[in-house]
Amino acid sequence: MQRLRSSNTGHRRDTSRLEGLFNCRSSFPRMQPRHSFSAFTSTIASNVLHGTALTFGLALTLQAAAQTGMPALRVVSELKDIRMKAVAALPKAGGDAGDRDSCPQLVIKPKSPAAKQVAAQGWAVMADVPLGAFRAVSFAGQMQAATSGTCNVTQGNVAVFQNDKLVALAYGKSAEDPAIGALTPLEGGAVRVWDGDISPLPVGDLRVDSDGTLRLSKVADEDAVCQGRALVPNVYNMSIDKARKALADKGWKPVKGGASPEPRQAALVKRGIGEANSCAGTGLAYCDFNYVGPAGKLTLTTVGEDDLPHVAGYDVRCR
């Protein structure tokens, strides 16, 4: 699936139906509202000088941490585009606050001591979640508002704290890459890491191994939901025809949607995908598809205008 980018402001619409999805058990990160726009272009600019300064600052921090006898902690990143190091100090955010104030819908008020430490260095905090005996805080140095409430996040990082002390930092291979955005907790104690694109996708899972190693690895093949009573396969970025088959293999049955004059929904129904429930005619072209299983209801959301659109995320309402 080609990643979506746009600079067209488009027309805003009522998104109360889609916004409601974020109030249940969700695979989506805390993210921008789903507003509409009519075209996609690749015009999100990067601040190269700002990014270079940030990367240099991180390099100095890593070097200093290695020389000051920080606690021994094994950290492993299995992802080629995200690095992770044991560190003991966090650099200040580069640039000025104006680089981070254009996407308030992505920024949270820091509440934990760990998140407050990050905010005190000038970073925009996006997520603050438990990670076993640790705490993971994602934050960014630059946020670029895109169309209809969407946002492109760069200079994203994940700080890992233990007893309110910084012990590790995950960061992208370059400051201009939207490699890291928000975080969502998973059943079992792991944390899902999302990218910072305007239509976010998960990039990996952060977990604590039995020996205490912090490991950032690829997205799991399946997620346990509803206290382990059901499984959801990894259908991210999968076309809807393949995703519905993968869901069926895990016991999720399609729920027939209602009649709709929306052309894309009608076309999906003609293809035999009768669970298409609603489609946005403009913007990121979200469509929802409903399923039911022994543990509850699942709503799959796709993005894009392909005849068979690709999965952006899912939401589960447990019984």
Residue ranges and their predicted role:
Residues 2-11:
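Extreme N-terminal basic, low-complexity initiation segments
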Residues 32-53:
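Bacterial N-terminal signal peptides that target proteins for export
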Residues 61-64:
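N-terminal signal peptide c-region/cleavage motif recognized by signal peptidases
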Residues 67-319:
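Exposed acidic/polar residues on beta-strands and adjacent loops within beta-sheet cores, strongest
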